[in-house]
Amino acid sequence: MKSEDPHPALATGQAPAEALGFMGFWADIDADYELRYQEWHNCEHMPERVGIPGFIEGRRYRALLGSPRFFMCYVTDGPEVLGSPAYLAALNRPTPWTSESLTHFRNPVRSLYRNHCRVGRAGGYAPYILQRRFDHKADAATLAGMVRAVVAEDTSGTLSGGLYEVDEAISGIMTAERRIYSGGPGRQQYLFTIEALDRDQAEAAGRRLDALMAEGASEINPGLYWLENRIQSAELRRPVAAPVAAAADTRFPERLTP
């Protein structure tokens, strides 16, 4: 039986422009902490975050081209979820494991976005995501037309694209977690994403997108990442709200022994 994405906007790619919120977090991780970081992110952090009301899914990617080395993201029911009391409670009460892990983040960039456009049917399990963080002289409607044009050229039905714009107000909120990793939002106003089942397909779409956006673009930060993990709220047995996230203190695991 063909599996379906439990959230209609992700399944069909036809979400209204403002229907989804998106958090993007780019960071390098200390080399001697990477395994520990992946364990934390898989086993505690993503399940905790995706259990917060309004969160749809979380993902983590590793860089193939560009930097930083890791890209973490969350999709929410709307941008307002990223400034909700439940989410802010989690950000201001990190677990011991989170507090430890965040000290190993380097070159962190965390931006909160509102969605202008999401088209195509590749879905969140597509193994490759190509990104362009950038500024542009054109307005959001014109930029959305560019990503729609690139996806429309694909005849395989296995390509998705999105345009996101930074929400400066909620991106700038200071929290306990942010004080630990000492980072903030990126400089660029916009984010293009192309999700694909094939690396060559993603890179070809990126070249078409680059040609369309070339005139008027500045501060371009490119990247190509492959998917390491994805968790959806529908997959959690007992999702928890942020106010009880501190219960993770009692299950703080021992360190891994290589």
How would you describe each model-predicted region?
Residues 2-258:
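Macromolecular interaction modules
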